[in-house]
Amino acid sequence: MSQFSLSQCVSMTAEQQEQSLAEINLRLEMMDAHQRVNWALENLPGEFVLSSSFGIQAAVCLHLVTQEYPDIPVILTDTGYLFPETYQFIDKLTTQLKLNLQVFSAEHSPAWQEARYGKLWEQGVEGIERYNQINKVEPMNRALKNLRAQSWFAGLRRQQSESRSKLPVLAVQRGVFKILPIIDWDNRRVHQYLTKHGLEYHPLWEQGYLSVGDIHTTQKWEPGMSEEQTRFFGLKRECGLHEN
């Protein structure tokens, strides 16, 4: 499929987009992660961006994509409630990989939000969704607009959750193309990549965390829990960034 016809996808319905991208996704499924990144850079429209939560295995996609596009803007939506270890990890990877880090946050500070709304994350699913809209979704939408993004790399993997288990390599979200180069990787493959390239897991990995987000909605893994249950008190998995 040509870049011109890909560009037409943005104005299609979700069903039309899926049908239009079906053939190319079959081809992308046969490629390895490096080939997917290079295919995207050659065939998808710029500007390109890469998003990262700087979670447990974030170094993989950050390294993979920046090896091919060193100066790609790396979007972080900072809620102000990340773990201290996450901020330290961000600083370390930014220096190590020479990242072009672009930080976007909510219009109002965490303290102001708490004064206005209370602790939204303690107000059930509705409160969590409102919190995510304010602190994740709106800043990401603003980032995509300000950076004039047309193609967006992200490090999601099918193994991470049921909600991600059927995601394609290439899709359209928020009016831009979204490509997931390591979507089919399992934990073993992630570990092999990190080891091969001298990269580290998030510091909290060693303390039993499988997934890391905000300090108040992230739980350490306990026997019998799925990875999904360690986030948002098990009420939901996604923060809204990767949902239409």
Curated annotation (Swiss-Prot):
Q: InterPro entries, per this entry?
A: PAPS/APS_Rdtase (IPR004511), PAPS_reduct_dom (IPR002500), PAPS_reductase_CysH (IPR011800), Rossmann-like_a/b/a_fold (IPR014729)
Broad EC category: oxidoreductase
Alphabetically list the UniProt keywords: Cytoplasm, Oxidoreductase
Reactions listed under catalytic activity: [thioredoxin]-disulfide + sulfite + adenosine 3',5'-bisphosphate + 2 H(+) = [thioredoxin]-dithiol + 3'-phosphoadenylyl sulfate
Q: Which GO terms describe its cellular component?
A: cytoplasm
Which PANTHER family would you find in this protein's record?
Answer: PHOSPHOADENOSINE PHOSPHOSULFATE REDUCTASE (PTHR46509:SF1)
Q: What protein am I looking at?
A: Phosphoadenosine 5'-phosphosulfate reductase
Q: To which species is this protein native?
A: Photorhabdus laumondii subsp. laumondii (strain DSM 15139 / CIP 105565 / TT01)
Q: Which gene encodes it?
A: cysH
